[in-house]
């Protein structure tokens, strides 16, 4: 089955965009496959569960689908991209970055990976200006406690900064921890459970004024997701004044066309985050790697000192404590 189509795909790496005029499939084979998939679309859940265990989900493609069609994705890039200025204060964010800059000369890890649970710029998903900003945030604001929801390479950065402060500890909530996480000195608690299982009261009891909540989630807004728990249950109930981080946030832009169309990146966390921030008198956006890359690149480049590429997906905001009842 699909012999002709697979022959056409042999020299095309996965995730590669192929324009419509360069056909990479056999019509008859794709029609046959479509009929099979339509039959399986409404198959008993045990069949669909088996497919999901193999890493494949079959879902309907229609007006109500939460996964955008390729036509919808391509069409959405025709008009100008919404700039989402409702949550950004340009002058305030530039001043905040200038405050962080005073510590940026300290953070100078090796460029190439050296292994052994040591941080390097290359070979990890938490790099670019995100890593520099995290280090400088910790050095500038000296949190006593950091809760990391999603831990790993970012924890190595935090450990370096906390050691420079000579104070502070990390609580990691990570259901699939890398082995090196267990050997990081600043990690005092490792909770190997999904964050959805952690009640909001735990966060409120663990964080004091000036502490950090670092979120690097699945980035998905769906039934039972970590994002729903964090943004709808945890954050509104925090009673202390804290700094909050979210990762892989591209605001004020959307995700690039190639990531949506060719890499299946349909992350929607940033839109729930934006809804949380709009007209929220308790919050103020302080730093955004993408924001500065798009609108303040000269200052962001200076912040990096030429050590690695500027940019990234970190967004930091402050949240005031809840008023007393």
PLM features: what roles do these ranges have?
Residues 2-245, 249-325:
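A short alpha-helical cap/connector motif
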